[in-house]
Amino acid sequence: MKKFIGDVELYEYHLREIPDILNDVVIDGGFNICDNNIKTLNNFPADCYAIYLSGNPITSLVGIKQKYVSFLEANRLKISNLDGCPEEVKILIVQNNQRFNSLQGSLKKISNGGALYIRYTSLSSLDRLPVIGNRVTIDLSYNKLTSLIGMPKKCHNFRISGNPLTNLLGGPEHITGNFDCYEHKLQNFDGFPRIIEGNVGMSIGGMFNNPLMKVKSYFEKELRSRCKIYGYVSLSEHYEQI
């Protein structure tokens, strides 16, 4: 099996397919094919450290051969789910893709200390959410989630802004980092984390039909009465902007 030492950089080469010379090659580095016109992952290398696919009309991740990858960036693609994704990824980024609507696929775990970024997609359910390792950042901002059922009880940073959630039931109880929840439709604090070791960023809103909840000082007081927050609280007056 052939081996290449170093990164393979093929971004913005106007490629329509992955060159067949790379089929089954082991790359001791990253593999970058961003911003081409590649539609399938035929001829994909056998293994590499990091995968950069963004900006291609790729409709499926089928073709990736390795079971583990440290970093996978899949922004601005045409995939609708995670079919073909490696079984374990440390950092996965899926952004700016309104066709993406499901976690169905082969992904089983986000590694310890890693991150899951799924942002600006049509994801509406956490069915098939992979196992989340220790101290993982989860960013699910600006999707179409209406429920957090299926989330782990503990994570590192948690960002859930821009979703039509009316409560946080099913969400993490313990956040070891920061928590962001702007532009929400929350009606109450049901499911709100019990412990947040970092900072909190939220939009204020008229929860409980109480106009005082639009007053920052009152909102923060209510928040801290329900949750042990180690850091500071940053509140925005822009709410229910979805």
Feature map (PLM): residue ranges:
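A structural signal for leucine-rich repeat
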Residues: 21-23, 43-46, 62-67, 83-87, ...
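N-terminal capping/linker segments that flank leucine-rich repeat
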Residues: 1-26, 31, 213-242
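Concave beta-strand-loop units of leucine-rich repeat
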Residues: 10-14, 27-38, 45-58, 68-79, ...
